[in-house]
Amino acid sequence: MKVLLRNVEEIVTRAELEEALASGTQLRAYAGFEPSGSVHIGHLPIITELKELQQLGFHIIVLLADVHAYLNEKGDFERIRETAEYNRRCFAAAGLSEETEYILGSSFQLDAEYMLDLLQLATVTTEKRARRSMDELSRSKTDRKVSQMLYPLMQ
């Protein structure tokens, strides 16, 4: 439990976590990355946490958010997918096991059901809330593209 609580800001709820741990079922941990460039030292804290969870028996899922990278103008899909594969190889070299599950965002984010969910979310998200998220993501504060408005909804 100590490893799970280290560097954690909030647990909803601790009792549910303890129950899940006691259940004997394999728990899952998830992290998402936009494959938009080189893997760097900033990735290591998350990779280290994932490795520790993996050693505790968690099933690790890594989202390689290729659609996010495309919306954020990081290249065409071919280049982004090459970068995603590079990211996967780097994460494996950093110690994530072969059992790690890697998922490309495009494997589900282009489906009709996901798109309907995204559109429904757009109907209840205020422009102010979306802009707050966009400001954290976008380097260009002026003349942003509509695609950058979708990005926060997909977070």
Predicted regions and their residues:
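NTP-dependent nucleotidyl-transfer catalytic core
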Residues: 1-155
